[in-house]
Regions:
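Localized sequence-composition bias
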Residues: 1-167
């Protein structure tokens, strides 16, 4: 199954936007991933920083505040996490037309894993664009030693250190 999923997701810059839904007033035009060295890639090392660059189109005639969430889903279903500006109380305001938003995921805590990426864009809690399995990336081995914390069993996730920048 993992092999099939890896082969069914394009590793090129030609992403598939066929599996999308939402109102469409604000839409994701492209998503690019960069490593700590600024190189566009889909392979990362443990403890690396992933820079998610989202190019968005605001079709409305005014500035709008939006919420963006990036879901990282393990291909083997062993991991599911979300990066979102709402978690950090960070406002993202888009101008009319094209906009660029960056989410930096710092100190990548994964090793030897493969992930699918979903992107959700909302305005006033209404889904404007939801693109599923838009991109595939993998984390290859690396050396990473870090102080860790064991979360209680009733805690349903882990916090991933990230920040948002509007360009």
């Amino acid at each position: 199954i993992t092999h099939y999923q890896e082969k069914s997701i394009s590793n090129s810059a030609e992403y598939s936007f066929s599996n999308r839904s939402g109102l469409g007033n604000i839409m994701l035009e492209s998503l690019n991933l960069f490593n700590s060295l600024g190189k566009e890639t889909q392979q990362f090392k443990t403890s690396d920083t992933i820079k998610f660059v989202l190019n968005l189109k605001n079709k409305m005639t005014k500035k709008v505040n939006i919420q963006i969430a990036i879901r990282l889903k393990g291909v083997d279903q062993s991991f599911d996490a979300m990066l979102a500006n709402e978690y950090l109380d960070k406002n993202i305001t888009l101008n009319q037309g094209s906009n660029s938003v960056v989410c930096n995921l710092h100190n990548l805590p994964f090793s030897n894993s493969s992930f699918l990426v979903n992107v959700l864009i909302k305005k006033n809690q209404v889904i404007e664009d939801f693109v599923q399995d838009i991109l595939y990336f993998e984390v290859i081995g690396g050396f990473f030693q870090k102080e860790s914390y064991v979360y209680p069993n009733n805690y349903k996730g882990i916090y991933l250190e990230h920040d948002w920048i509007i360009k």
